[in-house]
Design a protein with these regions (language model features):
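Structured catalytic/nucleic-acid-binding cores of DNA maintenance enzymes
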Residues: 1-211
Length: 211
């Protein structure tokens, strides 16, 4: 987000070019018509989604999945691994969505429409009481690694960060949720907050895929 923002805010998109149909949600023409001529007003992040807010109370949501990367480029790129290209109006260059695995997806939504965001739990920074995690985890026999990856409980941790959080907390990824003590949940939350905060600050492992 930080890397994209200076080069993207204030730009107006011309008609998107879609190379991989499943890279967008919904009809192609609806997406193209909705994005064409719209100006970027701001960017934000929610869980593992990047949000690009447009000037007509709509927003683009990008879920990059495992290999998706967003770049602002100076000229139209080669088609190799390109899923979606949003050219800038009146100038060369645009926003390029590269995805070697082709799992990433973009949504065009009204600003008030939560779409897939409605299924997300709070981010680590929004959780003030570790008992929230304790209550969620204590009824599950799933391994703690799987529970950390469950975005409906706590949003924002992917595979790499979940491993880092568990390592920092000295907890086995295979430990069932119901075996966690309250103190374990407090340590997990503290480390999740710290690791995600550092990742965002330094454009860390997964966040770096935004630039």
């Amino acid at each position: 987000k930080k890397m994209l923002e200076p080069d993207l805010v204030g730009k107006t998109f011309s008609r998107p070019i879609i190379y991989v149909k499943r890279a967008i949600s919904g009809p192609i023409e609806t997406y193209q018509n909705g994005v064409e001529g719209r100006k970027v007003t701001s960017l934000s992040r929610r869980g593992k989604y990047l949000l690009i807010h447009l000037d007509n109370q709509t927003k683009l949501l990008f879920h990059l999945r495992m290999e998706g990367k967003l770049f602002v480029v100076k000229k139209a790129p080669e088609e190799n691994h390109l899923s979606l290209y949003l050219p800038f109006q009146g100038e060369e260059g645009g926003l390029a969505f590269f995805d070697t695995r082709k799992f990433g997806i973009s949504y065009l939504l009204k600003e008030e429409d939560e779409g897939p965001l409605s299924k997300l739990g709070p981010e680590p920074s929004e959780i003030k009481d570790p008992n929230y995690l304790y209550r969620k985890y204590k009824r599950s026999s799933l391994p703690i690694k799987e529970l950390l990856l469950d975005q409906s409980i706590m949003a924002g941790l992917g595979n790499i960060y979940a491993n880092e959080v568990l390592f920092a907390s000295s907890l086995s990824p295979f430990l069932p949720g119901k075996k966690l003590k309250k103190e374990d949940c407090a340590v997990l939350l503290k480390n999740a907050q710290k690791i995600l905060e550092e990742a965002i600050e330094f454009n860390g492992s997964t966040i770096r895929t935004y630039h």
